[in-house]
Swiss-Prot record:
Lipid-anchored residues (GPI-anchor amidated asparagine): N629
Organism of provenance: Neosartorya fischeri (strain ATCC 1020 / DSM 3700 / CBS 544.65 / FGSC A1164 / JCM 1740 / NRRL 181 / WB 181)
Listed InterPro entries: ConA-like_dom_sf, GH16, Glycosyl_Hydrlase_16
Span of domain GH16: 36-289
Listed name of the protein: Probable endo-1,3(4)-beta-glucanase NFIA_089530
Biased composition regions of type Polar residues, renumbered to the chain: 379-400, 520-535
Carbohydrate-modified residues: N64, N200
Propiece residues: 630-651
Compartment list: Cell membrane
Subcellular location, principal: membrane
Membrane topology category: Lipid-anchor; GPI-anchor
Lineage of origin: Eukaryota, Fungi, Dikarya, Ascomycota, Pezizomycotina
């Protein structure tokens, strides 16, 4: 090797050593800062209540927060501590649901740091119980599990257990007061995990008789240490809120070895629970001198005991003064800000769709929007029960001429099931309810993808009123039409002659051929939940979208009877549009209109059908939202019946 290369290698090695030493010294010079803490009411408000089946197959019924509070299973004591107990009054059927209990979990996941739990009382040494304070990653066992406090039945010494995937050995010569009974944490050699049996008095009845105590866990990328301090032996640095682990003394568990802790133990959520029997307590029930009602089955004996002896579980409760999370160089304020920004769950998000006067508008969806200013001439979907109950007919009137780029705002309020439905029945000679010159579809031969209020295409399908039917349907990328009676964009089949465009209140040109009824069905767009835009798993708030999935529904046949003296032929069509709901689904509302064509006297004499047609926008709404669907259908039915009788009489 050349001298220069040798010098370079030695220099690199020295530099690397200096950097490592500097980093270690910097870390050692740091002190733990309080990042997060819980006490009293915050356990109820800031932790999740788990109310599903027990993953450990226990004879237990985990209850939700509301039930737990009402039944007194969780509460804040007069001293300000958090109480979490079990039902100790009900005698149960061993073949029925298990004993009611509580399991709570942190809402966020946590990594390396110092975790301190001050416990006044833990579930006592009782046959059939399995209490635990533990943590687990999102992907078990790959992300690891840390059982900080765990015991079953009559045990009086805590058991500390680590679980992870693959092979993770901690058989190093580590100084600890507990006893290492298994050094393999990985699932490659079974599900036992690496186990440290704590000292007597660290769990159950002796722990409670001594007035409780404090457990502290220091978790780094190279080791996990756990200390137990009886109430009378809590270090001064812990009591002062400035923990110094170097003064803690010998830990009860020191787990370190060839295992890569940074790789094997990822972010964890913390859990406090009390279950009964199950995979551990039930299977070792006979080993604890607990009563065996069924000598052939420790599990059944455990279930029988738990079901038939409610008073035995009065002391099976947790009373926790506090849990505190400390991290190097992280203050409580900055940690709270980071937690709020990265791990909090958004319960409701206001989403705005800004629309431009183009056929293909963009649909920005800002994350966690809390307020959206509304420009002039904006229709807004109400999101509260009160708003839906008090909608006025102003929301369903004909559309005024728009002068700017209007917007459609849709607010989603979590799991609300409220629904806004707008239905319009027009008895005048109206075919289409226009929006504006810049955003209306052509009445005859116009662009089928013209935007509705700037949002491309309300879901529309029209019955053909010409000899060559051409029903058109267009899709929209974001929000659908809101509950506005005249704000539906419709496309009518092209007729012979010059195409006509319907604007805000006038028809620019008149078709040169009469419409002829050729169909008795109308297609409507149906909403597909799969098309709804979704947020991520931790944030809600999305814009409901729908694609056209036409289905056919019958409509009355077009009347061929002459109206007003038999001089015209009337043909009807219905257009459907989807109205968004806060839940992300939509319902279809129909807009029915009559197109009337009147030939001249000369045309009638010659048999040549060349007359003129008139299309006018409706001037008012017959009925508005707020009526039940049944009332709406009744109004449509009566109006339609009167119209048919009138036409028949004239004929």
């Amino acid at each position: 090797m050349a001298p220069s290369s040798l010098f370079l290698s030695v220099g690199s090695l020295i530099a690397s050593s200096l950097v490592s030493a500097t980093a270690l010294e910097a870390r050692q010079s740091q002190t733990y800062q309080l990042a997060e803490s819980w006490q009293g009411e915050s356990f109820i408000n800031d932790w999740n209540f788990f109310d599903r089946a027990d993953p450990t197959n226990g004879y237990v019924t985990y209850v939700n927060q509301s039930f737990a509070e009402q039944s007194g299973l969780v509460k804040v004591t007069q001293s300000g501590s958090f109480y979490m107990g079990v039902d100790y009054e009900s005698t149960l059927n061993p073949n029925g649901p298990g004993r009611e209990s509580v399991r709570i979990e942190t809402k966020n996941y946590y990594t390396e740091g110092l975790y301190v739990i001050d416990i006044e009382h833990m579930p006592g040494s009782i046959c059939g119980t399995w209490p635990a304070f533990w943590s687990v990653g999102k992907d078990w066992p790959n992300d690891g599990e840390i059982d900080i406090i765990e015991g079953v039945n009559l045990q009086k010494a805590n058991k500390i257990v680590l679980h992870t995937s693959g092979s993770c050995d901690v058989s190093g010569s580590n100084d600890m007061t507990g006893t290492l009974s298994s050094s393999e944490c990985g699932e490659a050699s079974g599900t036992v995990g690496c186990v440290v049996k704590g000292t007597n008095g660290s769990s159950g009845d002796p722990f409670n008789e001594a007035g409780g105590g404090v457990y502290a866990m220091e978790w780094t990328d190279t080791f996990i240490k756990i200390w137990f301090f009886p109430r009378s032996q809590i270090p001064a640095s812990l009591s002062s809120g400035n923990p110094d682990t170097s003064s803690f003394g010998t830990p009860m568990a020191h787990l370190q070895g060839s295992c890569d802790f940074a790789e094997r133990f990822k972010a964890q959520k913390f859990i406090i629970d009390t279950t009964f029997c199950g995979d551990w307590a039930g299977n070792v029930f006979a080993e604890s001198t607990c009563p065996m009602s069924d000598p052939s089955s420790p599990m059944q004996s455990c279930v029988n005991y738990v079901a038939q002896n409610p008073a035995a579980f009065k002391e099976a409760y947790w009373e926790i003064n506090s849990i505190k999370v400390y991290q190097y160089g992280v203050s409580a304020a900055s940690s709270a800000a980071v937690s709020q920004a990265t791990a909090s769950k958004v319960e409701g998000t206001l989403v705005s769709v800004q629309a431009a006067n183009t056929a293909t508008p963009t649909v920005p969806v800002p994350a966690e929007t809390t307020a959206v200013p509304q420009p002039a001439q904006t229709n807004t979907v109400a999101t509260s029960a009160a708003d839906y109950a008090t909608q006025s007919s102003a929301e369903t009137t004909t559309v005024p001429a728009a002068t700017g780029a209007p917007s459609v705002s849709a607010a989603e309020g979590g799991d609300s099931e409220l629904e806004s439905t707008s239905t319009v029945y027009v008895t005048s000679t109206t075919t289409i309810c226009p929006v504006a010159e810049s955003s209306s579809a052509a009445a005859a031969g116009g662009k089928k993808d013209a935007p509705f209020n700037g949002v491309s295409g309300a879901e529309v399908a029209a019955t053909s009123v010409a000899a060559a039917p051409a029903a058109a349907t267009s899709e929209h990328p974001g929000a659908d039409a809101i509950a506005n009676s005249a704000a539906a964009t419709s496309t009518v089949a092209k007729s012979e002659g010059v195409a006509s465009q319907l604007t805000a209140g006038a028809l620019s040109e008149i078709p040169t051929a009469p419409p002829e009824p050729v169909s008795q069905a109308v297609s409507t767009g149906s909403f597909d939940d799969s098309d709804t835009a979704q947020g991520d798993s931790e944030e809600h708030g999305s814009i409901a979208s729908a694609s056209a999935a036409p289905s056919t529904i019958p409509v009355p046949a077009s009347s061929s009877a002459a109206a007003l003296g038999g001089s015209s032929i009337a043909s009807s069509f219905a257009s459907s549009r989807l109205v968004p709901r806060p839940t992300g689904s939509s319902t279809a509302a129909s807009v029915t209109a009559i197109a009337t064509w009147s030939p001249t006297a000369g045309e009638r004499a010659s048999g040549t059908a060349k007359g003129s047609a008139t299309l006018t926008a409706p001037s008012e709404v017959v009925f508005t939202p707020g009526l039940s669907n049944g009332a709406n259908r009744m109004s449509v039915g009566l109006s339609g019946l009167i119209g048919v009788m009138f036409i028949a009489a004239l004929a």
